[in-house]
């Protein structure tokens, strides 16, 4: 039900996993999603500043919803990290009640992406906003999952990120290769500076053995 808005860009989104205090160690993120049986809602909460979600694309200005990774808690039991769909701004761009954030400011590159931070203070979302492919919570708070092992469940959930990180490394390697290829092609054609013999052609940059 949320895919159409994401696909047609009518609802710009943010991927809210990384926290100020936890980047690669996703299993230890501190944001919580506590289930309230009385209202059948999850309460998304950031307990301290180290748990603020950080360096999120679209978070600083334009994001209207976020997929928030948090520790899922039901009946006092922590079932580990799960993902939740959380609206963060209204149509005018103002933060919704309980949601706050700030811009990450200028970066070393890619400043066209409005990276920012988000934090949540007792933000309530419907039970059905849990992205429940790998774990679900019934109306009475009963937790269930098709993957019994918490460790296997966690790594299965994050499996898609592995492909993304490999793709990023491949893209960087490809860009480096293309840059080197262009530089060598130029160095084999460009000529400048005459040798001591005026009858000789100007020198190719690739002919130099030392800079």
Set out the residue ranges of the language-model regions:
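Conserved small/polar residues in nucleotide/adenosyl-binding loops
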Residues: 209-210
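Flexible, small-/acidic-enriched active-site or ligand-binding loops
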Residues: 96-122
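Long, structured ligand/cofactor-binding scaffold of large enzymes
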Residues: 1-35, 41, 48, 53, ...
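Secondary-structure transition/capping motifs at alpha-helix termini
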Residues: 9, 35-41, 73-79, 91-94, ...
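A short core secondary-structure module
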Residues: 37, 41-101
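A glycine-rich, basic-preceded beta-loop-alpha segment at the flavin cofactor/substrate interface
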Residues: 56-58, 119-164, 184-206
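Mobile "lid/hinge" segments at catalytic clefts and subdomain interfaces of large enzymes
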Residues: 172-175
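Core alpha/beta catalytic barrel or barrel-like domain that forms the active/cofactor pocket
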Residues: 10-19, 83, 189-202
């Amino acid at each position: 039900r949320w895919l159409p808005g994401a696909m047609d860009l009518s609802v710009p989104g943010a991927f809210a996993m990384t926290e100020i205090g936890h980047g690669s160690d996703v299993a230890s993120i501190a944001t919580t999603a506590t289930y309230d049986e009385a209202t059948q809602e999850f309460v998304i909460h950031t307990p301290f500043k180290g748990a603020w979600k950080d360096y999120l694309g679209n978070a600083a200005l334009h994001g209207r919803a976020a997929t928030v990774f948090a520790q899922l808690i039901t009946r006092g039991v922590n079932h580990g990290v799960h993902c939740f769909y959380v609206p963060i701004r209204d149509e005018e761009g103002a933060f919704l009640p309980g949601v706050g954030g700030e811009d990450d400011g200028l970066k070393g590159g890619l400043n066209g992406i409005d990276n920012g931070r988000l934090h949540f203070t007792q933000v309530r979302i419907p039970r059905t906003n849990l992205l429940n492919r790998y774990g679900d919570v019934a109306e009475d708070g009963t937790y269930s999952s098709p993957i019994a092992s918490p460790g296997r469940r966690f790594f299965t959930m994050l499996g898609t990120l592995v492909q993304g990180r490999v793709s990023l490394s491949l893209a960087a390697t490809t860009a480096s290769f293309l840059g080197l290829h262009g530089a060598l092609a130029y160095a084999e054609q460009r000529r400048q500076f005459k040798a001591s013999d005026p009858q000789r052609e100007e020198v190719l940059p690739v002919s130099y053995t030392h800079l």
